[in-house]
Amino acid sequence: MGEKPDKYEILQDLMRRRGFAWGSFEIYGGSRGFYDYGPLGATIKRKIERKIREAFQREGFFELETPDITPEKVFIASGHVEKFVDPLVECKKCGARFRADHLVEEALGIDTEGMSAEHLTQLIREHDIRCPECGGELSDVWYFNLMFETRIGPYGDQKGYLRPETAQGIFVNFRRLNAFARNKLPFGVFQIGKAYRNEISPRQGMLRLREFTQAEAEIFFNPNETEHPHFDEVKDEKLRLYPIEHQLKNLSMIELTAEEAVKKGYIMNTFFAYYMVMVKRVLLDIGIPEDKIRFRQQLPEERAHYSRDTWDAEIHSERFGWVECVGIANRGDYDLSRHMRESGADLTVLIHYDEPKIVKKLEVSLNMKRVGPKLKKDAKRINELIKGWGEEKKRELVELLEKEGKVTIEGYELEKDDFIIREVEEKITGEKIVPHVLEPSFGIDRPFYLLLENSLVIEEDRTYLRIKKDMAPIEVAVLPLVAKEPLKSIAYDIFRTLQKEGFIAVYDEKDTVGRRYMRYDEIGTPYCVTVDNQTPEDGTVTIRDRDTREQIRVKIEELPKKLRELIFES
């Protein structure tokens, strides 16, 4: 027996040769982390985006489109300027730069997730880890911000960044989106577009890009209402889970229904579980095999700075193992609270009660007769400031006065008797809350590559893509048996009819029909329609199945209906 063929290399060759995808800027030597989609690849990519868009729209989500370039202050508020970093190290001899955590992982075979720059530097020194390019000594580790920086306008005085995620464009529009949703939670907003990350050393082909496409939904909900109203529709769906405790104990993944996973405490609530099922169903609809999908819960040190809990939908790759393709994160109120604080905008939602409630509230104000001589012209301003404080801050003030007997406000030391404090009852009909956010975030490029990898079939006499039929970049090829009349004219008329019926179709008369079958099998075309010598006699053609190679005969007038059944309804 010969060596097992290298599936990765075969797929890379097929992708380049047949027009799916290849590295960008080839004629100038290329640039790592950038890929171009060819005619066939771009079609599949659009189909993936369409499947995700349709899934979001079925949930009643609204679509938004916002700029790729974003002013710096947005990312200061979101935490990306401070937190969106990777550890970097430089060779003192040749100047090459590398991800420090990757170098340490490869050299020592350990997990470096969550390690500080100081800890990584210590390991590099202790184990004498050298530059993989020239063997030179490495510098201390420092943090490198992954956002692409730019300048907005001709004067260069406004710094901006290419967005590292599409989400912030949604958060900064929350006031308008909430008004559009009529102030009613929950509601979802999604965006499909480009994101950019200046990866230090992008590797693994299409799996780590500097420019990539995301489809992110931000689902705004009341944190006091975490039961999804339609959970019963998905509660029996099975999910393959790899929770934190199983990772820490080196246990295998488990398979539970969505309902069991919530009851056992693996998934925090039915709201979260519902959207995990939605993500799984989208991946299945794209054509990822069910046994290649799992959900892995991120360890606390892995989570993004905004995340309270994250589960990654991972797809298995023969070459790369389990690959993160979708993140489902509970972002809490992190983003809206940060943008409220930095912008001063009110990003709350008024929640109306079913019935009015009587609540006890603190009223705190200054005793103006006592403090007037002390505060003089500042007395009125400070009094209004205190009266405008929230309930929590007022209670903190009272506790401090009880404990210390005095406080300092705006540089003035004030005693307990300087305040008028009383508890009152108030009837309220609702309350303002900062909504929490659940975010299903799809990458598009990784599922694209893994769909092709998991569709590639290598047989003795052919290599072909057994891609899900409605995901094929060319849905039907129309072939005259030989390039002679009247077969050519009949075949071309059928081709034009199928185009008008909405099929992605091609007409091909070059080479033997056997070679043409192989050509279209290779790129995943599910059906070839052949016009043969019987066609002029009885008005029938053959439909050849890519996977089985079997053929059936149908009448030309029935062809669009039959193909629609085979491709989109089977």
Swiss-Prot record:
Write the record's keywords in alphabetical order, separated by commas.
Aminoacyl-tRNA synthetase, ATP-binding, Cytoplasm, Ligase, Nucleotide-binding, Protein biosynthesis
A GO MF term = protein dimerization activity
Q: Which family does it belong to?
A: Belongs to the class-II aminoacyl-tRNA synthetase family.
**Protein task:** Catalyzes the attachment of glycine to tRNA(Gly).
Q: Where in the cell is it found?
A: Cytoplasm
Kindly list the positions annotated as binding substrate.
99, 165, 212-216, 439-443
List the EC numbers from the record: 6.1.1.14
Please identify the protein, giving its name as recorded. Glycine--tRNA ligase
Task: Name the source's superkingdom.
Answer: Archaea
> Might you name a Gene Ontology BP term for this protein?
glycyl-tRNA aminoacylation
- How would you classify this enzyme at the top EC level? ligase
Reactions accelerated catalytically = tRNA(Gly) + glycine + ATP = glycyl-tRNA(Gly) + AMP + diphosphate
**Residues given in the record as ATP binding sites:** 197-199, 207-212, 324-325, 443-446
* Assigned GO CC terms: cytoplasm
Annotated TM spans: none
The cross-references to InterPro entries, in alphabetical order and at most eight, read: aa-tRNA-synt_IIb, aa-tRNA-synth_II, aa-tRNA-synth_II/BPL/LPL, Anticodon-bd, Anticodon-bd_dom_sf, Gly-tRNA_synthase/POLG2, Gly_tRNA_ligase_arc, GlyRS-like_core
**Listed HAMAP family:** Gly_tRNA_synth_A
Q: What is its main location?
A: cytoplasm
